[in-house]
Amino acid sequence: MRHKKQELKSSFLVTPYIKRLLMSHITGLSTAQLLAEPNLQLTEEQQIWMDNAICRLGNNEPLQHVLGYSEFYGHRFKCDGRALVPRPETEELVEWILNDWSTLNSQLSTLNLLDIGTGTGCIALSLAKELTNSTVTALDISEEALSLAKENAKLLEVENVDFIKGDILNKTFNSQLSTFNLIVSNPPYV
């Protein structure tokens, strides 16, 4: 009975759009190609993956964790249970910083930026990729999140980021805050 309940719950969660995303991921075909081939048959291995993905969605696992990635500011970030999923509206924060930096650029020779609670590294890495003359420090209290952010730095070929495990509330770290000319954070919703 619980299995049938789970199947029913999953069927409501998997909209045609989400199904196309899953199908595109597993087949490597674009959405347009999938629409052009409505009778596409999955291999047995692909069908097993698809069934597992739908089950995971039914268990309230985020789509980005099921797919293993999230798109953010034009880049693909590895995404899994080690950090929360980057929120689309956070891209506006990155855009705002980049726009303001172009104004401040004449006043400061280099940007020394701190990203507090870096998670996947989406803010720190997106800014570091755009502001190549900057020094970016990505801080997180979670070793697991930092390991994910480091993997994303490697995938995106970003080298101007230092990763630090630490607690911003720690007095020792607090004394170092004055070395940064920009501090950014987009903590999880409470």
Per-range role (PLM):
Residues 1-67:
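N-terminal auxiliary segments of SAM/dcSAM-dependent transferases
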Residues 130-135, 139-190:
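S-adenosylmethionine
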Residues 52-105, 109-131, 136-151, 165:
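SAM-dependent Rossmann-like transferase core, predominantly class I methyltransferases
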Residues 28-29, 83, 189-190:
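Active-site/binding-pocket entry motifs
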Residues 12-13, 40, 80, 113, ...:
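A generic helix-loop boundary/linker signal
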Residues 11, 26, 82, 155-156:
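Histidine kinase transmitter module recognition
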Residues 1, 98-112, 160, 172-181:
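Intrinsic disorder/low-complexity segments
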